[in-house]
Structure formats: structure tokens, C-alpha cells
Amino acid sequence: MLLNIVLISNLACLAFALPLKEGTRGSRCFLNGELVKTVNTSKVVSECCVKDDISIIKSNAEHYKSGDRLAAVIKYYRLYQVKDWHSCNPIYDDHGSFMILDIDNTGTLIPKMHTCRVECEIALNKDTGEVILNSYRINHYRISGTMHVSGWFKNKIEIPLENTCESIEVTCGLKTLNFHACFHTHKSCTRYFKGSILPELMIESFCTNLELILLVTFILVGSVMMMILTKTYIVYVFIPIFYPFVKLYAYMYNKYFKLCKNCLLAVHPFTNCPSTCICGMIYTTTESLKLHRMCNNCSGYKALPKTRKLCKSKISNIVLCVITSLIFFSFITPISSQCIDIEKLPDEYITCKRELANIKSLTIDDTYSFIYSCTCIIVLILLKKAAKYILYCNCSFCGMVHERRGLKIMDNFTNKCLSCVCAENKGLTIHRASEKCLFKFESSYNRTGLIIFMLLLVPTIVMTQETSINCKNIQSTQLTIEHLSKCMAFYQNKTSSPVVINEIISDASVDEQELIKSLNLNCNVIDRFISESSVIETQVYYEYIKSQLCPLQVHDIFTINSASNIQWKALARSFTLGVCNTNPHKHICRCLESMQMCTSTKTDHAREMSIYYDGHPDRFEHDMKIILNIMRYIVPGLGRVLLDQIKQTKDYQALRHIQGKLSPKSQSNLQLKGFLEFVDFILGANVTIEKTPQTLTTLSLIKGAHRNLDQKDPGPTPILVCKSPQKVVCYSPRGVTHPGDYISCKSKMYKWPSLGVYKHNRDQQQACSSDTHCLEMFEPAERTITTKICKVSDMTYSESPYSTGIPSCNVKRFGSCNVRGHQWQIAECSNGLFYYVSAKAHSKTNDITLYCLSANCLDLRYAFRSSSCSDIVWDTSYRNKLTPKSINHPDIENYIAALQSDIANDLTMHYFKPLKNLPAIIPQYKTMTLNGDKVSNGIRNSYIESHIPAINGLSAGINIAMPNGESLFSIIIYVRRVINKASYRFLYETGPTIGINAKHEEVCTGKCPSPIPHQDGWVTFSKERSSNWGCEEWGCLAINDGCLYGSCQDIIRPEYKIYKKSSIEQKDVEVCITMAHESFCSTVDVLQPLISDRIQLDIQTIQMDSMPNIIAVKNGKVYVGDINDLGSTAKKCGSVQLYSEGIIGSGTPKFDYVCHAFNRKDVILRRCFDNSYQSCLLLEQDNTLTIASTSHMEVHKKVSSVGTINYKIMLGDFDYNAYSTQATVTIDEIRCGGCYGCPEGMACALKLSTNTIGSCSIKSNCDTYIKIIAVDPMQSEYSIKLNCPLATETVSVSVCSASAYTKPSISKNQPKIVLNSLDETSYIEQHDKKCSTWLCRVYKEGISVIFQPLFGNLSFYWRLTIYIIISLIMLILFLYILIPLCKRLKGLLEYNERIYQMENKFK
């Protein structure tokens, strides 16, 4: 035993004597490496081994004793995998192309994106479809979008494009180029065979004829299968296919065929007469066959035996296979192979309540009005019938209508018979009573009834319901919470109508009245003004104004479910009291959570709440802070100031003065009453809290602290530099306005700048406004300062980054700007401040973004305000976004020169301007008649109008004709682009965890601290009883005691950028009109019609899906799905968020540690945040969303159609007499240029001369886009576009009777790829992406059209029920119909096989 103790003591001495050397621990990951940072810390940081895009980083920690605690020296090493990375001159960029881990002064690893600044050239080889990058030094590139590839290169690299259409962003150096390019044909087949042994030429030929190869293969395989089937009886299943054709042949044979003289069968010039008749009978001689035919014994052509023979024939089956394959491929081949701010809660609540009240009142009022109106109408009808019965009667003797007044019955008639109320005596004339007889009564009653009805509808209900401290001059002895609480607005019992501000401040001085009126006080801003005031007397005075100005708003808090209750209730639900965590059944918890048990919140069965608080000041303070935060929204204004004072001084018993005044007024608001009763209960808890003195700022403190200033004259004009500066505090005598700070410059008064006062960076005795450069003005004080009391205060200068000089900084960007007429070279540093720079030199340290602000970092530079800088121009060396250049050539010569240029790799799109707005496909033409005001010699203000679907890339050709049918000219209407776009703002980045930042501490004995200290955004971990024998700190001999605790944060690699929609969607349609002599385009908003002197456009829209609210972007692709908003850390994509302020995340860390005797433990963190990055990998890529190449984040949604465009094109006046349909034309000159069989086509410019106005048709050996042109002596230049699918030596063009030939100028290059803008239609060999087969179209556009109205609106469970019923019906049909039918079919096929064998004598 003694020997063991001696050995242990010796080991302990050796452990203390030998320092920990590098390599003893922490030498994992890699050996050697370059030391990049050393951090001294008392917080132990866990060792790391992580990788970024240029290196691997590891850390080694050496611990030592510092006083009574441990400290550590942490060394960070970097092993560069990209050796000469510094040659690319990197700079920090939020949207950079590669990630480097930065190490801050606490040892925390922070991922930062960077961009190289070496010049890089980006080009596109259109012949091969490759992106070409050139850089004279090492550089980093990234291609993202529909394809993704990235890496480092030097000198030159070629990256082939992979997809048929590419919308990509190429980043290389400081350039970022966005473009959209499409191959002429699909590349999926080529991409599949790429890398095989086949040469590229063979791959291209094979993929070009892929459909033909597949068709031939299918026919061959099908033919082999059919030959095999001929050996079985299954082949007779084709009888229904062959039989109709054989039957038709038999009918034609019997009726129309010419007969042979020898055998009486159909003539057979190349064969001998047969011995078998068409009815199947067999004879030995031709004469017997002829006799059989002559005697009419032949029953005719037998179709069924011939059909069975065809089923067994290999030739007929092969023909059937070919036909079936063609039909089958026409079916399956492609047709042509796309959180609310709590301050705003009351306003939101009031708005919702108002809208709901309007809806309710409208509904109730409409119902009451309807019932009331119906009642009035029914009453009037009943009154009318009663009056008619009382005043008149229908006589049964004579059939006429008599008045009841004076009517007498005598035997079989009355004294008024043969007379009717509608006229005089009828005598013996025939008259029968009808409704017309009472016309006078009806009209009279209708007028009277209408008047009565109007009177009944007049509303007659009129609802009217109107139902000691001097807070204006409070004394200095009353500035305690007890007295000040009596000045709270609700306690002043002002319940009458509001008082105007002029009456409230009538007793103030004129200057004070002007000042108060200038504040524009109202009920919405007065609470904020009270809270921002610095003197309690001013706050009390304005609380009094509030009580008079806003009595309804002040007492709204005591009305249950009012707008004023929303804020404190929301906070009460958000912050859980500590007592509710342990005793959730308590009435106060249920009251705050669900408004239950609010009448008994003080109930404390078994004294559980008392036991929880008594003797536990920490628990009491925790819940009191929550209560104070809630009450700040119950009594805003002065009450909020007093509650903050209570919280600061910890004089919680002073809360009774506020709670006691609120309780009597809250009897009608049960939830508020219950909450206040609980406040009274918790204040009775038996706890001892040490209070601090009151810290209210009062006028008496200001008055007694400084000496008076006699000279208070305001400065005459603004000044830049303040000499002999003094700080002055001025206030009104009664404290109506809060004290203001001023500065005295040579005894002249100026306003204290809101941005602070600084010492001049070249003369410390002078003062500057806002920064140390004296670039901002000191404004003179107001004239009313002479009426205030002013005190000289101690001169204080602002201490901020503007007052601290630095030799270097982490520069974000360089530039220049105008500062008071002088041009300054400036730098914006990572702290967001601007500095003057005299040299832009790198600091040559391991910090790659650290730059000197002067030569060799010798001089200190001070920041200045950005407001002093105007006309800022940032250097072009900073990141520059580029787009492909578009050149519109006005004449054919320049266009042909561009086509024949040898530059094949430039990202430039060349257009012949007159033909730019034509589609790539020749449109279908229709004829439209000219409309307008017809006059004797023509049409005035002529126009055409029609509609066209608003589909991107759709075009229509129109031949315009006169009313007599004669053609005038052709125009092409082209929907050039349909744009559905919205702006998005950046939220955060997310990605996989590549490492963990961690810090931990150990205590030898005792428990873990509560709460565990940690940085913002870090999560904590701990383990009790961590000290044991052989597992303890230096000098710690505890067993089963102590604590190991710490905090951690994930290091993530940013891969997904999360954006949120920040604007409403905008839908625009651009429509182009092209004629042979002119072309123009107009853009119309979906919501706003376009009316101009040339064209009128409006769009009838259809319902479309809206763009997603939150999207994720990775490598230029847009993903949608369940994504967290900023600040939300639910277990889905975006649970760990990297944004400008740091990293957001949550989780329960999983950790372990390795013990060392007499040494600090090695903490091993296996998990920190709950990173649900795998959920991001399950997001759905939305191919309809693309990122536009704009300066801000703009997303475009591909839409097939937005509706229908109604257009009206104004064409001016036409004179019939001056217009000729057969004009005499001479072609003076013609030039053509372009390419064969390409979307750009062949552009031709013609110079024509004519002496009349007329129209001419255009003919050519190529296909023409415009069919008819209008010629005019005043117009000589015309442009047409041709499509030449085959190469021709010459192009011929005929205009009217004139013809001309020209040799076209053909492009030297043979581009396989075409550049165009993001929203324009790309023309390739496949268009329909929604339905790629005819079967799909049958389902989507045929069957679904029938069943969609029936089942489309049913819920999931109803559809499931219908599917089950249909399945049961199908099962019954299968069991009782299909199976017996198949058995019957099998027997029928076997019977035909036996008959066939008998007919051919095989049995």
C-alpha cells in the first residue's frame, strides 16, 4: 500500500514538472502545417480538425495554471491543399465561389465565402457547346444552374455544357456571367453515349435518327414474335383484324372482278386455271369447276377460311407487325419530342375586429332588412285584399262588380245589376267582370301603399349613449413611486370626451405651447414620447396630457377582449411562469393560457405556490421579471417607466402601488383581474431581496450638479469646427420639455449633434460633429434657448469606432466619392464604416481580407460618416455581374459582317434589327378584313382586331384584305415573352455540419452553475460528478463530485441560400408586330391594359399557381418545400441558419470526455445543434422557377399561358383609288445573309422602286415568313426573312412581276448552340413537356375532362371510397365475366385450329 502511494506521488510530480509538448496530444489530423493564429483564453476551446475549400485546419491546446484557475494557449495550424491560393488575391464576398474558415479572437471558426480577384475571361464556343475560361494565374471558377461544376484552374479550361437548354451562372474571378443557351437538338442521347467507344460523329448520327432505329428494331423483334405465334392456335386471335379486309375483298370479288372464260373465276393472266373454287370445293378438272360455277352451286367467296389462312401466313403477320409498330410509335413517341411585431398587435387586432364587425353588421342588417321588408309587403297585400273585400263584391246574378255601399238584394237581382264599377250602365251589352274593372281602385291603393311602405322603412331608432396630487406641477418631494403612480393616466379618472391639446396646455407659456404643438402629439405616439423622455417631471406632465387627450384608449385596457389587451395576453402566453413549470395545474397558469379559473388565481391548495417561492429569491425574481414585462403593456407610458424603475431597484413591493390602483377598475375584465390578484399573492411571498437606491432622473439633480451659463446667444450660422467647446444642458423651468444638450463654441450656442461630438483628428483642442473629420455642420440653437435655464456640464466626447484610428482593416470594397467638393479614395471595411485610403496594399498576413489603409500600414485612419460621401463609385475590380451582349444591326452589311466574323467564342447575340421581332418558326396565316370608317374612296382610321393566346413564343400570321377581298399586306404578331416574376430577399444560409465550436469549464467540487454561461447562439451541456479518482483537474482530489459544463455551436458549410418573397408577383407580356417595312413591340401588364396610338392590348387572365413564399437556392437551382423562416429552428430544412449576425440553431448536445490523471479532460462533442440538413436534400426542385440575371434577387416562373390577348392594331387611312393590287416594281438591290436550317434563318434586305402604292406577293425558292408586302414610292427599303432548310447556291426572290437572284452570305461558323434571354422561347425539337405521349394527352385532355367535373372537387376519403367501390365492381366483372369469356375464347381458338387443319388436310 505504501509503495503504491509513493509511485502515485512520483507520477504526480512528473506530471507537474513536464510541460505538455506539441505532439503529445492533439497531433491528430495532419503533421506540420503553418501556424496561422494563437489564442490565449481562460475558456477551454475543444480541439478541431475541419476542412474548407483551400486547406485543413487543426488546433492544439496547451493548458497552464493562471492564479486559481486554468487557462490555455490554442494554436491553429493550416495545411494548404491549394498551395498558391494567395496568388488569386481573394476577397470576402457573401456570394463568393469558395468557402474559407476564418478564426476569430476567441478561437471560433466562422465560414466565409470568398472570391478571387485575378482577371478572368469567360467565353462560349458555340460550335462545340463549351464554356472557355482563361486566367493568367490560378483562379477559382463555379458554374451553377442547370449544371454544376467548380474547381481551381490555371491558364485555360474548357467545360462542356451537358443539357439541351442551360440556364447557368458562370463565376470566375470577379466576373459573374448569366446566360441562357439551347442546343438545336436534344442532348440527352448524346450525353448518354458520351465516354463510350463510339466516335462523336457516329453518336451524333445515331442520336439524330434514334426514332428510326428504335422503330426498325421494334419491327424486327415483333416480326420474330409473330412468326413464333403462327405455330400456335393463339394466332387466331387476329381473326377480327383480318376478317373485315377479307370480307371487303370477297364483296369486290363477287361483284366487280372480271371472270375467266375457262374457269369462271377472276381473271388470272399469269397463272393457269385452278382446280379449287373460291367457295372451298375441290374439282379434278377445270371443266368441272366451270360447270360448278355456271350452275350457281357456288356459295361465293369464303371469307373465314381465307382469314384463318392469313392468320397462319408469315407475310401477312409481318405486314401486320409493321402497321402496328407505326401506330404504336405514334402513340408513345413524343409529340414533338415547361412573425408579427408585438407593438403592431393592437393595430392588427383593431383592423381584424373592424372588418369582422363590418361583415357581421352587413349580414345582420341585411337579414333584418329583408325580414322587415317581407313583413311590410305581406301586410300591404293582406290590407289590399281586405279593402277589396270590404268595398266591392262580385255579383253572382249578373257577373259584374258592384260597390257594397248601398247594395240591396231584391229577389233574383240587386239594385246595381247590369252596372259595373268600371263604367256606366252596360244595359244589355255583353260584359264580364275582370281584374280590369278594379283598375281605379288598384292604382289608387298602389300609390297609397307605396307611401305607407316608404314610411315604414324609414329608420326610427336613434341610439345615443353618453353615458390629491397636481400632476401638472408635481413637487420634488412627491417623486416616489407611491405618489407618481397616482399620476398614471387611468387613475386620473378622465372618462368624458377627449379635450383638444390647446385647452390642455392653455396655462403653459407661449414658448412651451409652441414647442408642445410642434411635437404633433396624438394617441398613437404619446406613449413612446413619454418613454423616451429623460426627466420624470416631463414624463408626468405628458402623462397628464395623455389622460385628457386619450381617455377612451386609456380605459380600453379594462374592457375584456379589447385591442389594448392583445399585447399583454400574447406575452403571457409566450413566457411561462416558473411556478407553472412545476405546477401546471395552478389556476393562474390556466387563466393565462386559456382564460379559465381566472376568478381564483390566488387559490393555493397544499401551499404549493407558497412553498415554491418562500425562501427562493431566484425563483421569485424570475417570475417577477416576467410579471413586470407583462405589466409594461398593461400600463404604457408613465406606468412603464415606473415598472422599469422597480425592476432596476428590485423594490418589488412598490408594485403594490400600481397593482392596487388597477385592481378596482378591472372587475369587468376577468383575465386581467385574475392576473392582478396573482400579483398581489406573489408579493406576499416570504423572500428577502436586496434593494438598490432609486435612480429616477429629476430636475433637481440637473439643477444642483452644474454651474449656470449666462451667455446663451445662439450661433449666427452653422459651423464645421467648434473652437473652445463646452457642453451645456438647458431645460424649461417647470420641466414641460425634457432637458436638451447643447454645445458652446466661443460663447455661441449650437445644438448637440445627434451623432455625437468628436475630437478633431489633427487638433485635439477642437471638436467635430459626427466624426473626427469635421465634415458635418453644427446647427445654431433655437431662439427660445434664452428663456431656458442652462448649466455648463463636463465636456464629453463620443467613444465609438469613429474615434479610433486603425492602420488596416478587413476591406469589403474600394471606391471613390465626393466629399465637400474633393474626390476621396475610400474603403468600406467589414465593420461597415468608410475610411480614407492612400494606398490599396494587402497586409501580407494570413488574414486574406486584411488591407492597409496607407502605405505599409504606417498611418492611422479614422472612419467618417457615409452621409458625408456623395456620388460613390465603387471600383470595377469588385465583383461584376455580366450578361450576354445583344447587338441590333440596323443594316444588312453590318449584320453579314458579324456573321462572317471569325470570333466564334464571344458571348454576343447578333440581330438584324428589322427582323429581330420575328419568331423562329413560320406562323400559320389567316385572312382578316380591314375595319374602320368607310368613305367613298376608302377607309379612314382603319384597324384590325382579334385575339391570340398569351403563350410564350406563339405567333400568328395575318393577311390583311380590303372589304372586296383583295389582299393588302401581311403582318406577323409574335408573343415574344411572357414574364411572371417576383423579388425575393435573402434570409440565411444552411448546410451540413462540418465541425463544432465548443468551450468548456470544470469545477472540482460542487454543482454546475445555473444557468450555464454561454454566448448568444450557443447551446449548453453539462455533466455532474465528473471528478473521480484518476479523472480530475490539477490539484483536485475530489471523488464523485464536481461538474463539467460548456457550450457549443455548429460549423456549417453554406450550401443552400434561403430567400423569402418580398414583393407581389408581376406578369408582363411583350407583343411584337412585324411588317416588311417596320417592326415594333409593346409590353402590357396583366392587370393594366395598354392603349397607344399604334396598338391596344388587354389580357384576359386565367387562374395560375402563385410563386412560393420561401425558396432554397443551391448551385443556381431553385428548390421548394417545407423550409424554416428566419428564426425558426423546427426539425426541417433550415434548422441551422447562418446569417449576418451569426448562427441560429437549437438542440441537445451529445458529448463524452476522455479522462487524464491530474490533467484537464478532453471533451468530445458528437453532436451540438439538431441539424436537419437531410431534409433539404428531399426538397423538390422546381424547374419552372429560374433566377434572372439582375442586380437583385429576381425569380421568374415559366408559364405556358397567362390567358388570351385581345389586340387592336391601328393601320391608318387607305385610299382605294390610289391603291393597286398589281403594282409595277423594280428590285434595285438585294442582299441576304444567315445560315441554312437554323432558327435564325436567312435575312434579306431589298431596295425596291415603284411609282404606285399597292401590294405585292413574295415568292422565293426558300420559305418566306411574310407573304405579302405593301409597296410605296416613299418607301424603298424592305426586309424579309427566309427559311432555307437546304443549302442553295442562290436565293431567288420575286416581288410582284419583278425577280432577283443573289448569292447569300453564309456564316463561317456552324453553331450547335444559340444564346437567348431567360424569358424568350428556345426553339428545339421538342416542346410539349407536360404530356410527352399521345396516351398521356388522351388521359390528361380527354378522360380527365369527363371525370374532373364529377370527382375533381371530392375530398381524399370520398375519392378513396369511390376507388374501392370501382375496384370491387372490376373484381366481380373479372371473376364472373372475364374469366368465363377467356375460357370461351380459348375454346374458340382451338376450334379454328382444328378447322384449319381439316381444310388443309393436316389431320
Swiss-Prot record:
Paired cysteines (S-S): C471-C487, C523-C550, C580-C589, C591-C598
Glycosylation sites: N40, N493, N686, N1353
Keyword entries, A-Z: Disulfide bond, Fusion of virus membrane with host endosomal membrane, Fusion of virus membrane with host membrane, Glycoprotein, Host endoplasmic reticulum, Host Golgi apparatus, Host membrane, Host-virus interaction, Membrane, Signal, Transmembrane, Transmembrane helix, Viral attachment to host cell, Viral penetration into host cytoplasm, Virion, Virus entry into host cell
Domain of life: Viruses
Membrane-spanning parts: 210-230, 315-335, 362-382, 449-469, 1362-1382
Keyword Transmembrane helix among UniProt keywords: yes
GO biological process, one term: fusion of virus membrane with host endosome membrane
Signal peptide: 1-17
InterPro entries cross-referenced by the UniProt entry: Bunya_G1, Bunya_G2, Bunya_nonstruc_pro_NSm
Lumenal side: 18-209, 336-361, 470-1361
GO cellular component: host cell endoplasmic reticulum membrane; host cell Golgi membrane; membrane; virion membrane
Variant or mutagenesis effect after changing C580S: Loss of disulfide bond
Presence of the UniProt keyword Transmembrane helix in the record: yes
Coiled-coil zones: none
Cytoplasmic side: 231-314, 383-448, 1383-1403
Family: Belongs to the nairovirus envelope glycoprotein family.
Annotated protein name in UniProt: Envelopment polyprotein
Organism: Bovine Schmallenberg virus (isolate Bovine/BH80/Germany/2011) (SBV)
